[in-house]
Design a protein with these regions (language model features):
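Active-site acidic-Proline motif in GNAT/NAT acetyltransferases
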Residues: 89-91, 95, 124-125
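Conserved active-site alpha-helix within GNAT-family acetyltransferase domains
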Residues: 99, 124-142
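Conserved GNAT acetyl-CoA-binding A-motif
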Residues: 109-121
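Acetyl-CoA-dependent GNAT
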Residues: 2-80, 84, 89-90, 102, ...
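Short glycine-rich hinge loops at helix-strand junctions in the catalytic core
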Residues: 96, 113, 137
Length: 168
């Protein structure tokens, strides 16, 4: 059984580790050789503190009786809610846990008056996440973030959009 439960402080250390792993995974998508360091965990703790602010909801993902990840919802204003981050421990992936967690998050968001849509931010290299979100009906492009690297650029893949080449 998969269930979202509101974050509880007793899971702080494990949640900080998962947040650090989440960001480390995203770095690895760019082939960056980043390692988890003490500062990774300090930054993860700061992130956790931000996620506990009133305009956010943080849920732990439970599978059977174990916590296996987290899901973070942000309410930025207006009628759009954001599933800001979702993370499932590596050993529990491809078991439908993220799919069910997103569906449960959609129901949570629907329970708040005034929200008419849900958005995700996803890095283009995270193909697994893109396929999952698309499968769940997230097939409308909204805001596109364009970026200019001021220093070395490790982005070596190209995607065409409106006839223009964009690195990712």
């Amino acid at each position: 059984m998969i269930k979202l439960v509101p974050y509880a402080a007793e899971f702080k250390d494990d949640t900080i580790k998962r947040i650090a792993d989440f960001y480390h995974y995203h770095s690895s998508l760019l082939n960056e050789k980043a390692e988890l360091t003490e500062s990774s965990y300090v930054e993860a703790e700061e992130t956790l503190e931000n996620w506990l602010e009133p305009s956010h909801e943080l849920y732990l993902i439970k599978f059977k009786q174990s916590v296996v990840g987290f899901l973070h919802i942000g309410y930025r204003g207006g009628n759009v809610a954001w599933i800001e981050d979702i993370y499932v421990d590596k050993n529990y992936r491809n078991k439908g846990i993220a799919t069910q967690s997103i569906r449960d998050a959609e129901e949570i968001i629907k329970s708040h008056a005034g929200y008419t849509s849900i958005c995700f931010d996803v890095v283009p290299r995270n193909h697994e996440a893109l396929r999952l979100y698309h499968k769940l009906g997230y097939d409308n492009l909204s805001i596109i973030t364009v970026r200019k690297e001021l220093y070395e650029n490790n982005r070596d893949k190209i995607e065409k959009l409106m006839g223009l080449d964009f690195k990712y």
